[in-house]
Amino acid sequence: MEAFIKETGRAVVIPNDSINTDIILPKQFLKNILKTGFGPHLFYDWRYLADGKINPKFELNKPEHAGATVLITGVDFGSGSSREHAVWALTDYGFRAVIGGSFSDIFYMNATKNGLLPIVLPEAERQILRDIKPDETITIDLPNQIVTYNNNQFHFDINPQWQAKFINGEDDIDVTMKFEAAITAFEKKQPNFD
């Protein structure tokens, strides 16, 4: 997992509430277990018209939003079925963080385990962030748990263990491997049933 300490980048706003995992990545694209290749299918039914052509009105398709690394959204983001693929689509597209009013518990956990930082901010603060212009940047300072935009600073909470994993660029396997010697020693002490 790529370390996340401080991210300064452009943001795109999709202010809708209740964006579920089938909207984030429709079910027909769940045929792969690799974590890459899903970005082109992100928000597929919104990004593309019925004939398969790009929908020029959708925010992600506007040239001024190309390369955005932060998604600002509404409440209840990631509801619906549990699919890590939805998180993989967001990260494969290039998002490093999603700022919302709330997240589905399962989506939140999938995000933290796959290097996508979910940040919960109240409506008043997200309303200020919704005014971000395509040429402006937003900064997320994870060690200090601060989102900065246009001289506004917003504090967010994160579990200290998840924060450490992001800062150190460690997933669950990396953390487990820190205990490899202890695991091996434990295994050697167990009786052999061969």
From Swiss-Prot:
GO biological process: L-leucine biosynthetic process
GO molecular function: 3-isopropylmalate dehydratase activity
Reaction equations catalysed: (2R,3S)-3-isopropylmalate = (2S)-2-isopropylmalate
Gene3D superfamilies reported in the protein's UniProt record: Aconitase, domain 4
A Pfam family annotated for this UniProt entry: Aconitase_C
Enzyme Commission number(s): 4.2.1.33
Pathway in which the depicted protein is active: Amino-acid biosynthesis; L-leucine biosynthesis; L-leucine from 3-methyl-2-oxobutanoate: step 2/4
Cellular component GO terms, alphabetical: 3-isopropylmalate dehydratase complex
Keyword list, A-Z: Amino-acid biosynthesis, Branched-chain amino acid biosynthesis, Leucine biosynthesis, Lyase
Subunit and partners: Heterodimer of LeuC and LeuD.
Function, in words: Catalyzes the isomerization between 2-isopropylmalate and 3-isopropylmalate, via the formation of 2-isopropylmaleate.
HAMAP family, per database record: LeuD_type1
Cross-referenced PANTHER family: 3-ISOPROPYLMALATE DEHYDRATASE SMALL SUBUNIT, 3-ISOPROPYLMALATE DEHYDRATASE SMALL SUBUNIT 2-RELATED-RELATED
Family statement: Belongs to the LeuD family. LeuD type 1 subfamily.
Protein known as: 3-isopropylmalate dehydratase small subunit
Organism of derivation: Leuconostoc citreum (strain KM20)
